[in-house]
């Protein structure tokens, strides 16, 4: 498989991952994961190891009527990065996820970041516009 084909496959796997999560299709979600998948959130230092534990974490760890929309996926070889918008009860936040795939094309590592918005330093207000 060429690097171009691998890049397309990694991006497609990540798109399928988010589609399964949005649909709460935990069987399809789990099928995309390697048995030894590791999920980490550096900001909270949480780690979930193993497919069954990670599927359970998602199925039980996020109750409520939430939704997500993929904003962007960038992939290369067996790696991909996604940016999503996660919405629940009128509030939303963005998530950045880094994915690594194994040789079989299953997700083996996920590193998840949830950046919080913040006010910029006042000293540079004259150098930027706000949106």
Q: Where do the model's predicted regions map?
A:
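C-terminal and inter-domain tail/linker signature
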Residues: 1-131
């Amino acid at each position: 498989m060429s690097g171009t084909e691998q890049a397309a496959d990694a991006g497609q796997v990540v798109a399928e991952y988010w589609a399964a999560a949005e649909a709460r299709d935990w069987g399809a979600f789990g099928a995309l994961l390697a048995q030894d998948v590791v999920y980490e959130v550096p900001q909270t230092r949480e780690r979930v190891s193993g497919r069954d534990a990670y599927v359970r974490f998602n199925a039980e760890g996020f109750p409520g009527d939430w939704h997500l929309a993929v904003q962007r996926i960038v992939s290369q070889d067996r790696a991909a990065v996604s940016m999503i918008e996660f919405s629940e009860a009128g509030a939303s936040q963005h998530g950045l996820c880094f994915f690594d795939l194994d040789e079989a094309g299953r997700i083996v590592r996920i590193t998840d970041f949830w950046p919080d918005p913040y006010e910029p330093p006042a000293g540079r207000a004259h150098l930027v516009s706000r949106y």
